[in-house]
């Protein structure tokens, strides 16, 4: 589905996107095994953990399966119900996930899937009186809108927003090792990740050498057909990117 929806190479989709989702699943299982409903604090007070209620979940297009698992699983595992709105650009992965949830035997209404454009559906979810919490992954502009709309009903909000993550490069490091790793990480998923190190802040004395290594590394990145196996990257998602 990711190959068709966003042009992610089949190898990367299987080995990174799907593998990351499985990693989240294993981590949540470990956490749940240790989770206690009642915890006695050092001062004698008792902390009681209870389900929040209905959670509104908005996921992005760039890591669709990973983000769906990251939001839906902990909500359901802790006794919450949820409404998932995937990116309108990558709805197929969410639809497949909904089928899996249904086949697993979850009662109707525990997991709900709604599709539509972010500014319209996302705003309606964020303002809805029956949703107690919003979780959003996407742009800073989108996160700002969710926070503003959720404030009308004093919802809890969690955000994971995109940015321009810098790498600091000093002259005394192993320049080739560091720059090759930075360029590879930046180009991963065709540069379409929230944590892509899209900036290098370089010490002036090694600037020319860093530029040379970075250019060579970028030139060596292969772009290929998403249907083909291999370490190449795929196309950009759309013209805006």
Describe each PLM feature range:
Residues 133, 141-241:
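ALDH superfamily catalytic-core signature
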Residues 10-35, 241:
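Long amphipathic alpha-helix in the N-terminal Rossmann-like dinucleotide-binding domain
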Residues 1-4, 37-41, 193-195, 226-230:
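Short coil/turn segments at secondary-structure boundaries
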Residues 3, 14, 26, 126-127, ...:
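Alpha-helix boundary recognition
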Residues 1-6, 20, 32, 205:
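N-terminal alpha-helical segment of soluble enzymes
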Residues 8-17, 45, 113-115:
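Short loop-beta-helix segment that forms the pyridoxal 5′-phosphate
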Residues 37-177, 230:
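Rossmann-like NAD(P) dinucleotide-binding subdomain of oxidoreductase/dehydrogenase enzymes
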């Amino acid at each position: 589905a990711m190959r068709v929806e966003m042009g992610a190479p089949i190898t990367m989709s299987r080995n990174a996107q799907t593998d990351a989702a499985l990693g989240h699943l294993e981590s949540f299982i470990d956490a749940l095994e240790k989770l206690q409903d009642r915890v006695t604090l050092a001062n004698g007070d008792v902390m009681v953990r209870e389900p929040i209620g209905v959670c509104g979940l908005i996921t992005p297009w760039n890591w669709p399966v990973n983000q769906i698992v990251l939001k839906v699983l902990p909500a359901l595992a802790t006794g919450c119900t949820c409404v998932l709105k995937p990116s309108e650009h990558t709805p197929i992965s969410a639809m497949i996930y909904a089928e899996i949830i249904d086949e697993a035997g979850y009662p109707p209404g525990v997991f709900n899937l709604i599709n539509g454009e972010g500014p319209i559906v996302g705003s309606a979810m964020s303002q809805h009186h029956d949703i107690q919490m919003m979780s959003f992954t996407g742009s800073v502009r989108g996160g700002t809108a969710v926070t503003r709309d959720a404030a009308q009903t004093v919802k809890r909000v969690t955000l994971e927003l995109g940015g321009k993550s810098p790498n600091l490069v000093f002259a005394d490091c192993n320049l080739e090792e560091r720059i090759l790793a930075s360029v590879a990480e930046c180009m991963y998923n065709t540069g379409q990740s929230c944590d892509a190190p899209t900036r290098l802040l370089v010490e002036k004395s090694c600037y020319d050498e860093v530029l040379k290594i970075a250019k060579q590394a970028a030139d060596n990145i292969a772009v290929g057909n998403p249907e083909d196996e291999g370490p190449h990257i795929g196309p950009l998602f759309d013209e805006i990117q």
